[in-house]
Amino acid sequence: MLNWQVIVQLVFLALIITTGPVIIVYLSTRERNLL
């Protein structure tokens, strides 16, 4: 049986992996629009 801390860490890693590229693209497009 998995510990709840392990589950929280797995969910946190999954969120970082899925939202990482989106945040990078968002920041790059925002900087490009500011220029």
Swiss-Prot record:
It comes from the Eukaryota. Its main location: plastid. GO terms for cellular component: chloroplast thylakoid membrane; photosystem II. It is a single-pass membrane protein. The chain crosses the membrane at residues 6-26. GO terms for biological process: photosynthesis. It is found in: Plastid, Chloroplast thylakoid membrane. InterPro entries: PSII_Ycf12_core-subunit. The keyword Cell membrane does not apply. Keywords: Chloroplast, Membrane, Photosynthesis, Photosystem II, Plastid, Thylakoid, Transmembrane, Transmembrane helix. NCBIfam families: PRK13686.1. PSII is composed of 1 copy each of membrane proteins PsbA, PsbB, PsbC, PsbD, PsbE, PsbF, PsbH, PsbI, PsbJ, PsbK, PsbL, PsbM, PsbT, PsbY, PsbZ, Psb30/Ycf12, peripheral proteins of the oxygen-evolving complex and a large number of cofactors. It forms dimeric complexes. A core subunit of photosystem II (PSII), probably helps stabilize the reaction center. Belongs to the Psb30/Ycf12 family. This is Photosystem II reaction center protein Psb30. It comes from Cyanidium caldarium (Red alga). The gene is psb30.
